[in-house]
A protein has these predicted regions:
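Short amphipathic alpha-helix adjacent to the substrate-entry channel of hydrolases
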Residues: 34, 53-71
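N-terminal cap/lid segment of alpha/beta-hydrolase-fold proteins
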Residues: 1-35, 162, 166
Length: 274
């Protein structure tokens, strides 16, 4: 049986957490079941115009099947998507999770946040913001309260400068939320990265025509120069927005099935860090 509930993080109800997971089993009857579950926060993309269900529930349910307690974040988008609003939404999500560890039986020392496309930008940038004093001040939280153990970035728009330049060059401001229309270092995941940030897992495809491969490779290279613990997987085909990359999200349309192995690789990576 899947338990699902919705927690509003802000008074306007535009940021929320959906809780998805399995009930805790009787310890005496299921000795294999850990008392505390690792946590996965899923942050879907949608160009900061909307939050994609395709990158929310299929990924979340797959994490739940691996024993994770899953939380799906819905954050401010559109004209309300610029810094700092979505990052504050994520900080409130992390705060809620850590403050409710007993309610959900959570291992709050083993939190992974997975973001896709624009959600990958949000997550990658947040991972850098946890080290910035100005973000501590506006969030009311310190680095220890904000930080999580791992982040997973799927075809992420995390390298903001070339993305903002493309949007302005082609005048496609109506195709994205406000955050992507201007550049500022404070909302650039590459510029904010630092030695000691969360462990990073990145996957991408060479033929992605929305977030170019060189933009992601440049971000990963920058992490390596800083000494960040990063793992990078680059697929020959996949395009953009494939979520789980299997029949869970692509039941009829043709797609490069090999990209779906990213989840198996990611779970193996997470296990290696535990």
């Amino acid at each position: 049986m899947i338990i699902s509930e919705k927690i509003y993080l802000t008074e306007d109800k535009k940021a929320s957490l959906e809780v998805i997971g399995l009930p805790m089993f009787d310890q005496s009857r299921s000795a294999w079941q850990a008392e505390e579950r690792p946590v996965a926060v899923i942050v879907p993309g949608g160009s900061y115009l909307y939050c994609s269900d395709r990158e929310a529930y299929p990924v979340g349910l797959t994490f739940a099947s691996k024993g994770y307690q899953v939380f799906i974040l819905r954050y401010h988008v559109g004209d309300e998507s610029d810094y700092p609003r979505p990052f504050l939404d994520l900080s409130l999500a992390v705060k809620y999770i850590k403050e409710n560890k007993e309610k959900y039986k959570l291992d709050i020392n083993n939190i992974t946040i997975a973001g896709f496309s624009a959600g990958g930008h949000l997550v990658g940038t947040y991972a850098g913001l946890v080290n910035r004093k100005e973000f501590h001040e506006i969030s009311g939280m310190d680095q220890d309260q904000l930080k999580v153990k791992n982040i997973i970035l799927g075809y992420p728009a995390v390298n903001l400068k070339p993305i903002a330049e493309k949007i302005n060059h082609y005048n496609i401001h109506d195709k994205v939320g406000k955050l992507f229309t201007t550049y500022d270092e404070i909302k650039d995941g590459k510029a904010l990265a630092y030695n000691g940030m969360a462990n990073v897992f990145v996957f991408h495809s060479i033929d992605d025509d929305m977030v170019y491969v060189n933009e992601v490779a440049d971000y990963v290279h920058h992490l390596t120069t800083l000494g960040v613990n990063v793992e990078f997987h680059l697929f020959n085909q996949g395009g953009h927005g494939y979520s789980t990359g299997n029949k869970f999200t692509n039941p009829k349309e043709g797609f490069p099935t090999r990209v779906g192995v990213w989840m198996d690789i990611a779970f193996d990576w997470l296990d290696s860090l535990s």
